[in-house]
């Protein structure tokens, strides 16, 4: 199959790509699983609370077991006491979900294929800036009628990276750093020809 190479003036030529990487049927369940697994793996999981054992103090029994008329108590750090520990306190945990490499790559193929079908994949000859200026990047994106885009390059230049940092609807990634969430998050995905070829090698 072939993808059109786009210029500010319109389509200019095509680039041949593999059906394996850009012509797969969309598998919604697989893509959903990949997205959920990626987002779960991105969680910090550092939330922590103190249970009755972790709260400082409470080593001494506050009063004797019998004879006071009060309810029996073994520690002042019981969860039912003020300043006591938390019942079922949250602990740090790893939310990572296992996803086989084959499934992950297959999900990327599905997403890229669907982007191509929906004409959300914009292939350009090259995408770089002469200076690290956000204004220049905005003007360049406007030439392609883009405001919300992920820019994928084989190797991201420092100028492009610095220029895109201040745009919350624009992100820049090299081929090795793309993921399912970033691909579906943006309205358009701008990809250089060299990035397409590199991605084809990885996913074929």
Swiss-Prot record:
GO-annotated biological processes: translation
InterPro entries documented for this protein: Ribosomal_uL4, Ribosomal_uL4-like, Ribosomal_uL4_dom_sf
One annotated GO molecular function: structural constituent of ribosome
Keyword terms: Ribonucleoprotein, Ribosomal protein, RNA-binding, rRNA-binding
Classification via SUPFAM superfamilies: Ribosomal protein L4
Region (Disordered): 47-69
Role this protein plays: One of the primary rRNA binding proteins, this protein initially binds near the 5'-end of the 23S rRNA. It is important during the early stages of 50S assembly. It makes multiple contacts with different domains of the 23S rRNA in the assembled 50S subunit and ribosome.
NCBIfam families, per the entry: rplD_bact
Subunit structure: Part of the 50S ribosomal subunit.
Listed name of the protein: Large ribosomal subunit protein uL4
Taxonomy of the source species: Bacteria, Pseudomonadati, Pseudomonadota, Gammaproteobacteria, Cellvibrionales
């Amino acid at each position: 199959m072939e993808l059109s190479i786009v210029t500010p003036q319109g389509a200019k030529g095509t680039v041949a790509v593999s059906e394996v990487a850009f012509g797969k049927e969309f598998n919604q369940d697989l893509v959903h699983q990949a997205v959920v697994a990626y987002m779960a793996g991105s969680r910090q999981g550092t939330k922590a609370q103190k249970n009755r054992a972790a709260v400082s103090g409470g080593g001494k029994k506050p009063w004797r077991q019998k004879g006071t008329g009060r309810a029996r108590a073994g520690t002042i750090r019981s969860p039912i006491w003020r300043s006591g520990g938390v019942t079922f306190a949250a602990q740090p945990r790893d939310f990572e979900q296992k996803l086989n490499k084959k499934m992950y790559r297959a999900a990327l193929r599905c997403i890229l294929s669907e982007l191509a079908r929906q004409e959300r994949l914009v292939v350009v000859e090259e995408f770089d800036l002469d200076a690290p200026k956000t204004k220049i990047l905005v003007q360049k994106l406007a030439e392609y009628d883009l405001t919300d885009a992920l820019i994928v390059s084989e190797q991201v230049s420092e100028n492009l990276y610095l220029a895109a940092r201040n745009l919350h609807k624009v992100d820049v990634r090299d081929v090795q750093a793309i993921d399912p969430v970033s691909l579906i998050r943006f309205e358009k995905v701008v990809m250089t020809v060299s990035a397409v070829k590199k991605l084809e090698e990885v996913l074929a």
